[in-house]
Amino acid sequence: MPAPHGGVLQDLVARDASKRDSLLSESQQLSQWTLTARQICDIELILNGGFSPLTGFLAQEDYNGVVHNSRLSDGTLWTMPITLDVPEQFANSVKPNQRIALLQDGTIPVAILTVKDIYKPDKSVEAEKVFRGDPEHPAINYLFNTAGDYYIGGALDAIQLPQHYDYPGLRKTPAQLRLEFQSRQWDRVVAFQTRNPMHRAHRELTVRAARETNAKVLIHPVVGLTKPGDIDHHTRVRVYQEIIKRYPNGIAFLSLLPLAMRMGGDREAVWHAIIRKNYGASHFIVGRDHAGPGSNSKGVDFYGPYDAQELVESYKNELDIDVVPFRMVTYLPDEDRYAPIDEIDTSKTRTLNISGTELRKRLRDGGEIPEWFSYPEVVKILRESNPPRPKQGFALVFNDDIKVDRDQLSIALLSTFLQFGGGRHYKIYDHNDKPEFLELISDFVQAGSGLIIPSTWSASNKVNSANVYTIGHAKDADIKLASTEETIFHIVQKVVLFLEDNHFIQF
């Protein structure tokens, strides 16, 4: 088992356990900062040692070293800036050497930060050096549109880890996981990083990796922040709990990682390797386009397919963790088995595969997902969380250019929908622009209802749902009406056809 990065596991909770009560009391008297969702993930991995050798949020000297050279000020390899970003108003309220209580959800103190410095980073440099500068990169979008303009650096005193109310038995800290491996006498462990559900191909490639390296398997999925649009972690964890049963007995272990991904490609892959070393893994599977967010709106990839593997491999000796390249496997239907695609002559051997896009389409449309691709229990979980279109909800928002009587159009649509039956709940919901209303719309849609919103709704694009559609004459309307379609009958007909084409209604 490798030593932690930097030589010592920085388990701050264990280090500060004897003074926890005094720290808790002190925190009530200090200025307070409520941590953001990303900061909650970061501080948990600082406090539990997952980010060893870090013992706090980066001060300016360390930050500059990481951004420009992928190294802390003492020369230690570290590729991702871990910063406490705050708005200018809060930054102006604190001074060096001041102590600040850091809270979860505004009420739960998790640590006290001793301020070393407050600085305003050059975000354009961070964006270019760390994430290659494309403004469409999700981390750059976060940097400029969500993160505070000032960073506060300093060391932490641990009060407690952030609280989680789900899967307590699966949330192992680095110290706990290392003890688990020792108790099982696992000195060689290959870690598998994922933010997606796992299917048969993933099981096959991880088993192959274990056999090739004479190691056991750590399934170590991210359950913090991942790429926008990813499947929620509750669905994924249920999948992992089922697929772990499909591994040869005693070969695999499941533990959850509370990481906030940046989708930082090659730099993030090195960061992931460091984290897995801290958790006790001796080997790490690095995938094709590892931790990459795909491509931008012009179809240009943010990272090359092998950038991550090459950068991690270049630091192999310094990382003290062996890189296992992700070998794509494909299904051979004539032999009913999976094999690495680089070993197959596809001109002579028949292969089958289902892409992520095709899988999402089959889930959406209720299409068949064969057992050679995924286990039945996994498919069942995915279908429960991703019902086909006829069982999904939707909301229809009237634009302000509709000229017919809105109340009558609402009644006509409701009456038309109700005659289809099918178990979907339909409701007319007049609007206001309060945030609570936006949340309610999203809840109704996710619960499978059909909503009709007759009043003009300028904030419709703020609803956190993919199935909210506008009706009107404007070019950007989802259901666009021609100038001649001014009767309620014509509009209802157009709406019904739209819903049928998108599989919400089946005849």
Curated annotation (Swiss-Prot):
Biochemical pathway: Sulfur metabolism; hydrogen sulfide biosynthesis; sulfite from sulfate: step 1/3
Main location: cytoplasm
Region of interest called Catalytic, as start-end residue ranges on this chain: 166-391
Listed GO biological process terms: cysteine biosynthetic process; hydrogen sulfide biosynthetic process; methionine biosynthetic process; sulfate assimilation via adenylyl sulfate reduction; sulfate assimilation, phosphoadenylyl sulfate reduction by phosphoadenylyl-sulfate reductase (thioredoxin)
Residues given in the record as ATP binding sites: Q193, T194, R195, N196, G287, R288, D289, H290, V329
GO cellular component: cytoplasm
Region (Required for oligomerization): 392-507
Domain of life: Eukaryota
Active site residues of this protein: T194, R195, N196
Subcellular location: Cytoplasm
GO molecular function: ATP binding; sulfate adenylyltransferase (ATP) activity
EC supergroup of this enzyme: transferase
Parts forming coiled coils: none
Assigned EC number: 2.7.7.4
Site (Transition state stabilizer): H199, H202
Annotated segments matching region N-terminal: 1-165
Catalytic activity line of the entry: sulfate + ATP + H(+) = adenosine 5'-phosphosulfate + diphosphate
Subunit note: Homohexamer. Dimer of trimers.
The record's note on its domains: The oligomerization domain is distantly related to APS kinases, but it is not functional and does not bind APS. It is required for oligomerization of the enzyme, although the oligomerization state has no effect on the catalytic activity of the enzyme.
Protein name: Sulfate adenylyltransferase
